[in-house]
């Protein structure tokens, strides 16, 4: 009986996506805000930069760095309201390491030199706080990715900034030292790593019983790159063995969707727990890395590309949903069992960029068009917000076209937000903003795919909102609620300048307005670099 129901749902979903894609690509349904329809891939001719806007982004980066240097260096994270710091990322100077590749791309030789010298003085074998759990995921994407990216850039396109070869070579040395210590995380019965490790006083795993697909499915790019740079295949083998559990998932659940695997996996045997799937926290960057590994080496990682295609197609079939009050918008919901819940997040807005990137690599127009549609819809969340910035989490009521959105998942907004929902098509469930990049990131991919300068204008709108709402005397800070304007005297801040503000948000803004270069995404899919989930460019294998 369950199989029959599942087949029926899949069949209904196929009808839905056929209608949805047809209306998106061909029907020309009237839309607000000038949304694109039937977008054509641009030739790989150079796209125009905007020097004045690019300079403004550089100024924001330097302001952020100056405040970090003044109040927080060499510690991890600046607290811009209280003008102090915290060591929330192991005490190794997360903001500096994470911001290094951006400083290199902006060709700020002074900041690059300062960070290289700070890294030289950093001991990556101990944490500042004893018994502090280290996140394998966060340490890989921020530190390992940052070190390897800087090494790649300073060894190639930006070698003129590497005035001291000893400092440059120390980047790879530090990455090796760090990865060797982190490797204990993979010492589990299944080879799926524990996401938490203790470095000191004794090196050991923390002892978690499961891990999310984001936390261990977003390691393979950095660990494979480290193997390619060193010739030591141990690092790649560890990460790829873990990844195999996701490429060939094991589950006891009666209902799953093709390509959209669950979220949590047992370290003991590699089996998935309850079926939860989507592009939100816990899942997002696993899907992102499938297509990025294909970009890194389309032959060696062809199976990763095939897995991404399945996930992308299922996302279009079973997760795509339009709000009841804004049928012109399309978001991706989350699966809970056999029901699609119409909820999404700032993290999930990366889905548009991933579909565009996959479409460019595969030269598949349908993926590009759907990715652009998602990117535009998620940016509309920004435009409708009183602050001009999108919230951490939001929800909507499905318009009835998604078969997996059952009546039980329908939840109306609170009365005070009903009029806002009528206009915007969403209502927030967590109104915070912590300087995240994903919506701007997807606009960047939309611009690189289409050459349409409206995406530059939208990114500039977002930057103006960030300057207006988040810039304070001590740096850039998060917001407790994007539903409050600058003039609202009750507005409050999240007192933290996350390292990804320098690594990702400002980098994507800069790349949006920078002149064409070999770092930029190309519409023909022939890229020299692939950006990790922290926006650190890594040299594609064989380039």
Give the label of every model feature segment:
Residues 2-543:
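Glycan-recognition and catalytic cores of secretory/periplasmic carbohydrate-active enzymes
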């Amino acid at each position: 009986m369950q199989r029959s129901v599942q087949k029926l749902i899949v069949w209904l979903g196929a009808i839905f996506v056929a209608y949805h894609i047809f209306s998106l690509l061909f029907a020309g349904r009237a839309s607000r805000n000038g949304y694109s329809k039937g977008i054509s891939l641009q030739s790989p001719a150079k796209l125009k930069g905007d020097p004045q806007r690019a300079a403004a982004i550089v100024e924001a980066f330097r302001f952020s760095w100056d405040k970090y240097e003044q109040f927080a260096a060499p510690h991890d994270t600046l607290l811009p309201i209280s003008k102090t710091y915290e060591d929330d990322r192991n005490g190794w100077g997360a903001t500096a390491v994470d911001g290094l590749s951006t400083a290199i791309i902006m060709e700020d030789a002074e900041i690059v030199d300062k960070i290289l010298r700070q890294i030289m003085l950093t001991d990556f074998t101990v944490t500042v706080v004893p018994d502090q759990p280290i996140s394998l995921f966060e340490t890989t994407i921020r530190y390992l990715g940052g070190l390897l990216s800087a090494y790649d850039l300073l060894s190639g396109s930006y070698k003129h900034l590497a005035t001291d070869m000893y400092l440059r070579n120390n980047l790879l040395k530090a990455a090796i030292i760090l990865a060797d210590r982190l490797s204990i995380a993979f010492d589990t019965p299944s080879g799926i790593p524990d996401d938490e490790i203790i470095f000191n006083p004794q090196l050991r795993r923390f002892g978690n019983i499961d891990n999310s697909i984001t936390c261990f499915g977003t390691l393979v790019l950095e660990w494979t790159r480290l193997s390619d740079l060193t010739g030591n295949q141990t690092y790649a083998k560890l990460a790829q063995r873990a990844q195999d559990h996701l490429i060939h998932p094991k589950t006891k659940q009666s209902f799953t969707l093709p390509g959209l695997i669950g979220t949590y996996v047992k370290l003991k045997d590699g089996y998935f727990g309850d079926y939860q799937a989507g592009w939100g926290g816990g899942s997002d960057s696993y899907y992102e890395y499938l297509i990025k590994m294909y970009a890194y080496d389309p032959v060696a990682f062809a199976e990763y590309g095939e897995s991404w295609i399945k996930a992308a197609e299922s996302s279009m079939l079973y997760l795509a949903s339009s709000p009841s009050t804004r049928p012109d918008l399309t978001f991706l919901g989350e699966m809970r069992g056999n029901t699609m819940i119409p909820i999404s997040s700032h993290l999930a807005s990366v889905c548009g960029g991933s579909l565009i990137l996959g479409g460019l690599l595969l030269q598949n127009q349908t993926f590009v068009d759907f990715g652009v549609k998602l990117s535009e819809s998620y940016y509309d969340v920004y435009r409708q917000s009183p602050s001009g910035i999108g919230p951490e989490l939001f929800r909507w009521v499905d318009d009835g076209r998604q078969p997996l959105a059952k009546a039980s998942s329908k939840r109306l907004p609170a009365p005070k937000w009903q009029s806002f929902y009528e206009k915007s098509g969403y209502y927030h469930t967590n109104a915070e903003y912590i300087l995240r990049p994903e919506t701007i990131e997807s606009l960047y991919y939309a611009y690189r795919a289409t050459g349409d300068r409206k995406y530059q204008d939208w990114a500039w709108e977002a930057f103006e909102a960030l300057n207006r709402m988040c810039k304070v005397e001590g740096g850039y800070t998060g917001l407790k609620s994007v539903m409050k304007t600058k003039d609202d005297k009750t507005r409050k801040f999240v007192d933290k300048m996350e390292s990804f503000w320098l690594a990702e948000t400002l980098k994507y803004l800069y790349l949006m307005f920078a002149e064409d270069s070999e770092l930029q995404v190309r519409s023909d899919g022939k890229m020299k670099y692939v950006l990790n989930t922290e926006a650190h460019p890594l040299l594609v294998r064989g380039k």
